[in-house]
Amino acid sequence: MAHKKAGGSSRNGRDSESKRLGVKKFGGETVIAGNIIIRQRGTRWHPGDNVGIGKDHTLFALSNGVVSFQRKANNRSYVSVVSMVEAEE
């Protein structure tokens, strides 16, 4: 009577898919209008000049240029897109 008892089912083995958040274009990188600069939850970075914000707080370029990060007096981080002409000056 060599019977093997059925093993119990495990209650582990579930995990959510990663959301691939984070900075997609870093400071000094060239972007074209519509490029996603940052995917984030909440406003860890705020939109500056020539940057729009989506309903999921994604920051994206509104014009062609170079990405610039800065921290203002209110201690918030802002992301801007500086046009190529301004960047050369």
UniProtKB/Swiss-Prot annotation:
One of its GO terms (cellular component) is cytosolic large ribosomal subunit. Gene3D superfamilies: 2.40.50.100. Residues 1-21 are annotated as: Disordered. PROSITE patterns: RIBOSOMAL_L27. Keywords: Ribonucleoprotein, Ribosomal protein. GO terms for molecular function: structural constituent of ribosome. Transmembrane segments: none annotated. Pfam families: Ribosomal_L27. It comes from the Bacteria. GO terms for biological process: translation. InterPro entries: Ribosomal_bL27, Ribosomal_bL27_CS. HAMAP family: Ribosomal_bL27 (MF_00539). Belongs to the bacterial ribosomal protein bL27 family. This is Large ribosomal subunit protein bL27.
